[in-house]
C-alpha cells in the first residue's frame, strides 16, 4: 500500500479481528474504524472483495464515520478493566455453586447472612474446606450482630447438616477458585491504579471528587472513555456513545422507538453504579 501511495485506510470493526491489523497499520496510514451498521450495502451477492471495494468507495466519498479508537495506553487499561468485569461475573457464579453445595448438605446459613460474599459466610466455608463440620465450632465464626439478630439456636440449626468427603472436596476446590479470582482481580486493579497514577494523575484525582466515584470507578472511567474529551462533540454525544441516551426514531409524527442503544456496556455499568452510589451520599450534588 505504501508503494501505491495509499494514505488512508478504512476497515470494519469486526469483533477483535480488526485490532492486530490496526496495530500494524497505525504508524503508516490515517485509519478509520467503521461500524458495519453504517456501511451496509444493499442486499446482493456478498463477498470479502465486494465488501472491501464498497468500504474503499465510501472512504473516497468521505462517507465513513470513524469509530472512537483510544490510544494504546487506554487500550491497555481497558484490558485490565474488562478482565475485572469478567472476574466479578466468575466470582458470582462460583459463589452460587458454593451455596448450592452447602444447600445440598442442608447448610442454610445463606438464609441468615446479608449475602454469600460476607465475612461470616466465607469463614464458615473455609472451615468446611478444612474438614470442620461441628455446628458448635462453626457458630463461633459468625459475627455477633447476626447471632443477636436471629438467635444462636437458629444459626446453630442452620449449620447442622450431612457433609460427605466429596462435598468437602468440592467446597475446598470452589474456595480455591474464588481465592484465585479475587487475587487476579486485585492484581488487575493494582496495575490500573499504577498506570493511572503515572499517566493521568490529575484526571484520577479530579474524578474522585465527584460524589459516587471512588478509586475503582475512576480507573474504570478513564479506561473506557480516556482523558481526551475532544473525541466527543458534546456531553450528549458521550451519553449516546455510553448507551444512556434514548434513540430518536420518529416517522410521520409516530414514535417508533425510544429505547437506549447498546453503547459501551462496561462504561454503562460503571456509570449506573456511580449514580446509585451518588443517590445515597449525603454530599450535595450541584
Whereabouts are the PLM-identified features?
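A detector of single, family-specific signature residues
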Residues: 1-286
Amino acid at each position: 500500500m505504501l508503494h501505491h501511495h495509499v494514505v488512508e485506510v478504512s476497515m470494519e470493526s469486526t469483533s477483535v479481528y480488526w485490532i492486530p491489523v490496526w496495530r500494524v497499520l497505525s504508524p503508516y496510514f490515517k485509519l478509520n474504524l467503521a461500524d458495519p451498521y453504517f456501511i451496509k450495502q444493499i442486499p446482493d451477492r456478498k463477498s470479502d472483495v465486494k465488501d472491501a471495494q464498497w468500504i474503499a468507495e465510501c472512504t473516497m466519498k468521505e462517507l465513513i464515520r470513524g469509530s472512537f479508537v483510544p490510544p494504546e495506553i487506554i487500550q491497555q487499561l481497558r484490558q485490565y478493566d474488562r478482565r475485572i468485569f469478567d472476574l466479578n461475573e466468575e466470582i458470582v457464579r462460583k459463589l452460587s455453586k458454593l451455596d448450592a453445595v452447602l444447600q445440598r448438605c442442608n447448610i442454610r446459613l445463606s438464609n441468615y447472612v446479608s449475602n454469600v460474599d460476607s465475612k461470616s459466610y466465607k469463614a464458615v466455608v473455609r472451615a468446611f474446606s478444612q474438614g470442620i463440620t461441628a455446628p458448635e465450632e462453626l457458630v463461633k465464626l459468625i459475627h455477633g450482630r447476626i447471632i443477636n439478630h436471629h438467635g444462636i439456636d437458629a444459626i446453630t440449626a442452620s449449620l447442622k447438616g450431612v457433609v460427605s468427603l466429596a462435598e468437602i472436596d468440592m467446597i475446598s476446590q470452589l474456595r480455591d477458585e474464588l481465592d484465585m479470582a479475587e487475587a487476579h482481580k486485585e492484581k488487575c486493579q493494582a496495575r490500573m491504579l499504577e498506570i493511572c497514577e503515572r499517566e493521568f494523575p490529575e484526571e484520577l484525582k479530579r474524578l474522585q471528587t465527584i460524589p459516587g466515584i471512588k478509586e475503582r470507578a475512576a480507573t474504570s472511567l478513564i479506561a473506557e472513555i480516556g482523558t481526551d474529551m475532544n473525541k466527543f462533540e458534546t456531553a450528549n454525544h458521550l451519553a449516546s456513545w455510553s448507551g444512556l441516551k434514548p434513540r430518536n426514531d420518529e416517522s410521520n409524527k409516530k414514535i417508533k422507538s425510544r429505547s437506549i442503544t447498546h453503547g459501551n456496556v462496561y462504561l454503562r455499568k460503571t456509570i449506573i453504579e456511580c449514580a446509585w452510589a451518588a443517590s445515597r451520599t449525603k454530599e450535595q450534588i450541584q
